[in-house]
Amino acid sequence: MGEPQQVSALPIPPMQYIKEYTDENIRKGLAPKPPLPINDSYMMFGNQFQCDDLIIRPLETQGIERLHPVQFDHKKELRKLLMSILVNFLDMLDILIRSPGSIRREEKLEDIKLLFVHMHHLINEYRPHQARETLRVMMEVQKRQRLETAERFQKHLERVVEMIQNCLASLPDDLPLPNGADSVKTEPMDVQEPCTDHYKGSQEAAASMKEATIDKDAAMCVIIDEMT
């Protein structure tokens, strides 16, 4: 009779898991499917939980006596619980000194345990608020970082534009053009020309200005090449 197969409580090693999802297995449809969502109950840390359970369950559903009222101030109740724990701890020390074997020691220990359970429960009721506040702070940090990044980009852009304008302003007017290009000549337009000639002349003037700008850019590139 063979020995029963032992099942590990831990997941399989990562490399063995990765080997199941190779390109060939995915192409052939042999890769394992993802596990189905849990619909009823599950085990976690040795305890069974229902999927529809509340994140923070009331004390009554856990079989624990409620010491505070239904409507209360969390801060006041937490302070009261803290003082009660301190007083009960001092009582416990007094019992341990006077009569360590007394039954009151177990009773006082249960009282302290109940107080700690209530304190943890009230603290856990702040968890949703803590999660929302953490998300808000995280989003504010991301917003501030993005605004600072955009501001730095804007400053760099202004600096680059200023440098380019200074470079263009420092170019002499009689700078020789590369490849023997002719200088651009512009003449005033005759006011007696018809509208069609005026439109044609505007197009020619715009083309001339564009060529002049290109020539200046080319000349600046030549200067930079000579400097380097």
UniProtKB/Swiss-Prot annotation:
InterPro entries given in the database record: Immune_Mod/Transcr_Coactivator, Med7/Med21-like, Mediatior_Med7, Mediatior_Med7_sf
Keyword Transcription regulation: yes
Keywords in alphabetical order: Activator, Nucleus, Transcription, Transcription regulation
GO function term, MF aspect, one: transcription coregulator activity
A GO biological-process term: regulation of transcription by RNA polymerase II
Gene Ontology CC annotations of this record: mediator complex
Family matches, as SUPFAM superfamilies: Mediator hinge subcomplex-like
Compartments in which it is found: Nucleus
Main subcellular location of this protein, as a coarse class: nucleus
Keyword Transcription regulation assigned: yes
Function: Component of the Mediator complex, a coactivator involved in the regulated transcription of nearly all RNA polymerase II-dependent genes. Mediator functions as a bridge to convey information from gene-specific regulatory proteins to the basal RNA polymerase II transcription machinery. Mediator is recruited to promoters by direct interactions with regulatory proteins and serves as a scaffold for the assembly of a functional preinitiation complex with RNA polymerase II and the general transcription factors.
The family this protein is said to belong to: Belongs to the Mediator complex subunit 7 family.
Subunit-level organization: Component of the Mediator complex.
Name under which the protein is recorded: Mediator of RNA polymerase II transcription subunit 7-B
Source organism of the structure: Xenopus laevis
